[in-house]
Amino acid sequence: MTKVTYTDAAKKHAVREFLFSYFKFNAIVGLAGPNINEYIQWCKSKGYEDIEVWENTPDVLMNQLLTLQHPIKMKFGNILDAEDAKPNTVYDLDYCSTVYTLEDHITKFKNNFIMTFSLRAGIQFTIKEFFKTRKEKIIKSIVKNSPINHTIFTTNQGKYIFTPYCDTSAMCCIAKIK
């Protein structure tokens, strides 16, 4: 089932609010999801002035362009073609696929990102494959239950936050925060 909106996804919204609190930039590059105007309004409410949205499905892009109510940078193509190291930019990569189908995406983006994955492959497999693909070793992990359930992973190359959640299906976000 393809979602047409995330307005009723309370857990997704809580995770998004929590993770984006770690990024204080004015630019965002992302995948807008099913409702581009909802996404842009949310970005603007968080202070993002420079918004670049990528879409690689022609029908979805056409629908987004027909309903678009805000001036933004709209790119047709694979987000792998996006510049991956823009200064003062967060990358919002809401893939909704399993980790093992996104190896190129996981290795491309180095810093300041939030990646959303399906947990169909399981939590442990997702975590293990993510860091294996990035060629990083987990040095320390700290589990916290507040303000939402999350794990802070410190690796040999940085710091990440992992947040599992479930609205209609089991999902997770992994954010590179340092």
Predicted segments, located by residue:
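S-adenosyl-L-methionine
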Residues: 1-46, 54-88
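Short, flexible/disordered intra-domain loops and linkers
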Residues: 3-6, 124-134
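Conserved beta-strand signature within the Rossmann-like core of class I S-adenosyl-L-methionine
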Residues: 111-125
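Class I S-adenosyl-L-methionine
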Residues: 128-178
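A short acidic (Asp/Glu
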Residues: 17, 36-44, 62-67, 84-86, ...
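A conserved beta-strand element that flanks and buttresses the S-adenosyl-L-methionine
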Residues: 92
